[in-house]
Amino acid sequence: MDFDMDLAKQKNNDNPVYYVQYAYTRMYNILHKEGTPEFTPVEHYDLLTDSKEIELTKQIAEFPKKVEEAAKHRAVNRICNYCYDLAKLFHSYYNSSRVNDPSNPQLTNQRLGLVEATMITMKNALDLIGVSAPEKM
């Protein structure tokens, strides 16, 4: 395995660690931004019908399986790849969807729930590989 020290020092999306941490920071800031309503857990997330929301939900659901596979095969790189894939899906979702839609509070609440679930999953994955999950970058 080759380690590119110059790439590791870069603070841009070319650096995969920065890319993943930036996704986490973005999630954190969405949930803590002034004027954002507080997420209230709901029983059903039936308003999350966008294809990117469904992809993100499926990726979150894969996390326990990915952890089990990584442990079974002693392949921590699988968690690294999972983090990158989750970040990629989240960035794509963020760039195409408006999480906080004041005209539709129920949809906003469900989207905030999706962001929170993604953030918790990312934090757990980063903890497993010893990478920090910064609230600010």
Over which residues does each language-model region extend?
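Non-catalytic interaction-recognition regions
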Residues: M1-M137
